[in-house]
Amino acid sequence: MKKWRSRVTTDGLDRAPHRAFMRAMGLDDAALAKPMIGVVSMKGEQTPCNMTHDFQVDAAKSGIAEAGGTPREFTTVSVSDGISMNHEGMKFSLFSRELIADSIEAVVHGLAYDALIGFGGCDKTLPGVIMGMIRCNVPSIFIYGGSALPGRFDGRTLTVLDSYEAVGGFMTGDIDEATLEGIERSCLPTIGACAGQFTANTMAMVSEAMGVTMANVSMIPGVFAERAQVARQAGRLVMQMLQRDGPLPREIVTRKALENGAAIVAATGGSTNAALHLPAIANEAGIVFTIDDVGEVFARTPLIGNLRPGGKYTAKDVFDIGGTAVVIRALIESGHIDGASLTITGRTIAEEYGNANPPDGEVIHSTHTPIMRDGGVAVLKGNLCPDGAVIKVAGLKSVLFEGRARVFEDEEACVDAVRKQDYSAGEVLVIRNEGPVGGPGMREMLGVTALIYGQGMGEKVALITDGRFSGATRGMCIGYVSPEAFVGGPLALVRDGDLIRIDAGARRMNLLVDERELAARRQAWKPRPPRHRAGALAKYARLVGQAPRGAVTHEGPAEWPWFD
């Protein structure tokens, strides 16, 4: 009989106290003799995104027990991007990704669990769980809790993005208060993650393309009973993986798997946050996969998903035509996804997705007749972003913009100007000191971008920041500018009135200021004092790196000995 690593907590005379703790939790001799399988989720009342976890966790535990394991449930943190948006609380969003991975490592290794099922829901929980799985490198399955159903109001299909943009529309008088309230009350009719191809659904598709979850499950709505069946099957499957010693997360998450993940982001016009999360996931596997690598995949992958925010449809629409499998099969056949990559079943991506439906031509287009020949997301370079910046080009009417800079030292200053409509068409709004170190925490800017779009100015101005954007952001918005202003990146040298040229088609962004003038500004530049001197964010600011490597807090894979 295989000796599970959990035996270090259960076997032997000197483990009597350990067993006493477990017996106090209701475990009998039979349960103590079985492998211990961790089941982590974020179930709670922080956000509707994770409230679908309750019944799915129960189903996963049942599947584990049926297959001969002892499930051990635990929870970790989640910071709602929606509720923390546009205030200081957003500084904890990206930080929570690291906290999730760290807490999974602490529990799985601290209690010597043999395998893991990890649920994700709200945006940062997905990469956080996947990073934790790879770090622990025990047999693991990721499960997305599923998205909310779209809402309906006044004959329109809604997502939560409509409520953000409606605020801007009300400010300009384009809609009345009754319409604003109607959208607010209708846009999120169920629990589950945001319904568009925002960060959660993007990373859910990435999990399929990388092979770390079960095939074609990510687009099943979070409130559908089918999700319980998926979770139960996952419980059985993780026990099979344990019995055959894998495949382990680091055997699945290879460079090709990461390229597959980047390809599905580009093909669906997914969240720009994926350009941050993929390098961070790679880091846990010991792979250097930077924003440059992500950008190369983005550039060669066609946009075939007509999905919000750049397109028309939601995750439920993708589910209705056959799920993520439709996208993956199309990309395998066109050579944009490597079908030989491994999945958690031990089978290849091509084997798992070979029988998928073809594209319907409306929600998902064929790669032969794509919406755009280049991907829906692009990585830019230039003297304003020598290490990279990211823009979502899906849905843009023009990928070229040139205008004069209007500089804001933080998000609040820009939001105040936009609320007062104190800005003009043709301007380039620059929000700086919002990077991973300077924020700290690299806040998302959906609040301000949605106000701009709702005011009808979405493509009449550009916005550049060293902060992040929500997956729901649309318009001429460039984020993740690196190096960030706080550490002396070129963004710190921009002044009001400077001319900036953005050419997303050529993947370039440049500050059109004489080099001698920039050298003089750099000589005069002085670093700003840190915003936090104590607490979690202060620790984070001391550890976190820059965006091109994923804004991670450590480099390389963690090592932990298997117990003999």
Residue ranges of model-derived segments:
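Glycine-rich, N-terminal phosphate-binding loop and its surrounding beta-alpha-beta segment
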Residues: I64, S103-V107
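Catalytic or ion-coupling anion/metal-binding cores of large enzyme and transporter domains
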Residues: M1-E45, C49-M51, V57-V77, G82-I83, ...
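A short, small-residue-rich loop immediately preceding and capping a beta-strand
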Residues: V107-V129, I141-Y144
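Glycine-rich, highly charged phosphate/nucleotide-binding loops
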Residues: S93-D102
